[in-house]
């Protein structure tokens, strides 16, 4: 049983530097000397043994410390030898414990170790950074704003570059607003009015939705991403976002670039101009909460689980609302839309060729297929095979049900009138299917059991799905993604795991494990293999993400590129090159120094305190405030590591400078104010006998 000891008793128990101290760390006993524990001033151990901190002792008299003994072992080894041997301990855990014990030299060394994998400029996949835009002050009219806006009689700064800004995440008025946080919400967490809620892309355009406004960026080949449109401030938070940037074969005068936002039952639609700016087309009402908002061609579609569907036709400029069965899923291909309903029916809507019935002015909605068990269709995916004849495409539809069943139905071009035929059935899920994807090579299904994924290989003959040998099981894995209970991790619609990508190419899942995570994992949708992981360059949490298939350059040999877009809690937007990541899949990266090699190099010097904002660890005493390796003269050899020690000067002795060997000699002469760690084993000299001249410049973390 641990017995408390008062601070006064701790002071009285001070002993000689060679006194043996017994520690009980988390139930494991350690024995070391007082000198080993106290050579770093103002640390946890020096305060403990000097009586400034009350102690607990177990039944044997050992000082009890309620910390992890596994992590304490390499820390004690560092205090003994001044060498770091992690012994399989995770770097972040070791850094956390070093900060707890107040071991400033070890903390600095571990921070440099972490810089191996972290950079404010990202990694090789980092492709661009867009700072937060200017926040619209008022909604004076229903016309949109673009470019610099007048705020207080002066133009607000708008950064129009896809490079890293000098002040990460604090450009523009929105960035400054984040410094003055709103009062805490009822859940106790601060509100994030400027975080990215939704992000979507189409061809060379990006739409980013914040709480009360949205912006659009356009990619220009020579100048990069440019701000093209900024909406006025809205009175309600944006919950859904849709963008279309190019329509092939559209009639003259049609809107070919549009962006729409919705919340509740209200939908706002804007037309975008290629040269920048935009105008409001109109405000539409669905009458019930909008749960899905998307474009099929240049037709805007809004659906609700209640069974109501709204279509805005770009040709007739007509908004039509119609009731069907309660909608539980949807998918689109070409110019037609499929709706999965709770009664097991799959409805077919051609939104371009036959938008309205001639008699009753209703949408042309027809039942395409009904599930044999009449289970609700909770996920839909349609695949159009390449056109092999004048009669049309072979239509393949995969869908999942509320009972966990996955079915594949097909329709021949010659048998359009008879409807699709059931092709395959898989009963591998015990929870409702939430996502499904039928691509050229794979069938992928996801169920509600923590995003459990099952995949199959699809065999095709002349582009059409084949029964010999049919679909074969490929992989089973999970994409764990926890959702926030208070909504502070971002809008749920902006954190869709996917799969993303064209159906004739490799598709990927995007995994954000916890709501406030700053790191995303990109995994192949077919096997679950990790493609890469990206971490926000400014350290802010990622609140929304999507994958953009961007058009290639007009230059010879260029090809389309695939980008991962991540919206951050501070309002910024980062872009990552997934094409490069996919090309390097399976290759072993050739790096520079390993962590062990870096630690070996850092043992040859003392690190000065960080002057940047990334570390704020004050130096408690002059001995730990060394900004460089001090020496008595410019030709002094490096003591304590290699060579022979030179006699210390009196001035250096009074300041506590010199190598720890010099300080150890002073300690042996009886100087109580000079303490150092035990002398480590001498290192073999790599020189040819010439002394190493100490560097004149300050060594700090940025030197490595």
UniProtKB/Swiss-Prot annotation:
Coiled coil: none annotated. The modification Phosphothreonine is found at residue 163. It comes from the Eukaryota. WD repeats lie at residues 233-280, 283-322, 324-359, 428-466, 548-586. PROSITE patterns: BTB, WD_REPEATS_1. InterPro entries: BTB/POZ_dom (IPR000210), SHKBP1/KCTD3 (IPR047876), SHKBP1_KCTD3_BTB_POZ (IPR047825), SKP1/BTB/POZ_sf (IPR011333), T1-type_BTB (IPR003131), WD40/YVTN_repeat-like_dom_sf (IPR015943), WD40_repeat_dom_sf (IPR036322). GO terms for molecular function: identical protein binding. The modification Phosphoserine is found at residues 644, 646. The modification N-acetylalanine is found at residue 2. It holds the Pfam family BTB_2. SMART domains: BTB. The keyword Glycoprotein does not apply. Residues 611-631 have a biased composition (Low complexity). Residues 19-88 form the BTB domain. PANTHER family: SETA BINDING PROTEIN 1, SH3KBP1-BINDING PROTEIN 1. Monomer. Interacts with CUL3; interaction is direct and forms a 5:5 heterodecamer. Interacts (via PXXXPR motifs) with SH3KBP1 (via SH3 domains). Directly interacts with cathepsin B/CTSB. Inhibits CBL-SH3KBP1 complex mediated down-regulation of EGFR signaling by sequestration of SH3KBP1. Binds to SH3KBP1 and prevents its interaction with CBL and inhibits translocation of SH3KBP1 to EGFR containing vesicles upon EGF stimulation. Belongs to the KCTD3 family. This is SH3KBP1-binding protein 1. It comes from Rattus norvegicus. The gene is Shkbp1.
